[in-house]
């Protein structure tokens, strides 16, 4: 029974680790959009030309 428990913990850890690495790129893109929104860039129309990702969220 203890061996089964260890196998489940190991499998969960491996899946969690690989999922986290796969989502790192998406986190980077999201943090950029959050930074643009915090600066108020998305409310300024000429900013769309230099930051096309900013206007895409609407």
From Swiss-Prot:
Its main location: secreted. InterPro entries: Conotoxin_a-typ, Conotoxin_a-typ_CS. The modification Cysteine amide is found at residue 54. Residues 1-16 form the signal peptide. The keyword Iron-sulfur does not apply. The keyword Transmembrane does not apply. Alpha-conotoxins act on postsynaptic membranes, they bind to the nicotinic acetylcholine receptors (nAChR) and thus inhibit them. This toxin blocks mammalian nAChR alpha-3-beta-4/CHRNA3-CHRNB4 subunits. Also exhibits inhibition of D.melanogaster alpha-7/CHRNA7 nAChRs. Expressed by the venom duct. GO terms for molecular function: acetylcholine receptor inhibitor activity; ion channel regulator activity; toxin activity. Disulfide bonds join 41-47, 42-54. The cysteine framework is I (CC-C-C). Alpha4/6 pattern. Keywords: Acetylcholine receptor inhibiting toxin, Amidation, Disulfide bond, Ion channel impairing toxin, Neurotoxin, Postsynaptic neurotoxin, Secreted, Signal, Toxin. It is found in: Secreted. Residues 17-39 form a propeptide. Belongs to the conotoxin A superfamily. This is Alpha-conotoxin AuIB. GO terms for cellular component: extracellular region; host cell postsynaptic membrane.
